[in-house]
Amino acid sequence: MSLLNIFDIAGSALSAQSQRLNVSASNMANADSVTGPDGQPYRAKQVVFQVAAQPGQETGGVRVAQIIDDPAPDRLVFQPGNPLADAKGYVRMPNVDVTGEMVNTISASRSYQANVEVLNTTKSLMLKTLTLGQ
């Protein structure tokens, strides 16, 4: 593996973590969205990563394979005066776990920062390699 491959690998990680941050931000923004375009509460999303290695390579980058709906059930909130409440007075709310999303955001941010550091270290090594013969 050459040092140039590191740029591709770390770059793919930056892109994947950026998408993860976007999905988490969308989840938190819609944590209280009781109805969407289909009349149903917002469904939290999850990012599924996949190895993006070249055939025959043991190492490689990462890519977002898909963005799926979180299978967790909707939250039920007792609001008998709400026009969207069911016969028992419960309103179906999005299945967004705000605390979990904050943890996910911090994790994605740290991973992004770590990959930026990988790029900076690689750049520094390449510059030092160029000055070896001087």
Swiss-Prot record:
Pfam families: Flg_bb_rod (PF00460), Flg_bbr_C (PF06429). GO terms for biological process: bacterial-type flagellum-dependent swarming motility. Keywords: Bacterial flagellum. Transmembrane segments: none annotated. GO terms for cellular component: bacterial-type flagellum basal body, rod. The keyword ATP-binding does not apply. PROSITE patterns: FLAGELLA_BB_ROD (PS00588). It is found in: Bacterial flagellum basal body. Its main location: other. InterPro entries: Flag_bb_rod_N (IPR001444), Flagellar_basal_body_rod_CS (IPR019776), Flg_bb/hook_C_dom (IPR010930), FlgC (IPR006299). NCBIfam families: FlgC. The basal body constitutes a major portion of the flagellar organelle and consists of four rings (L,P,S, and M) mounted on a central rod. The rod consists of about 26 subunits of FlgG in the distal portion, and FlgB, FlgC and FlgF are thought to build up the proximal portion of the rod with about 6 subunits each. Belongs to the flagella basal body rod proteins family. This is Flagellar basal-body rod protein FlgC. It comes from Yersinia enterocolitica.
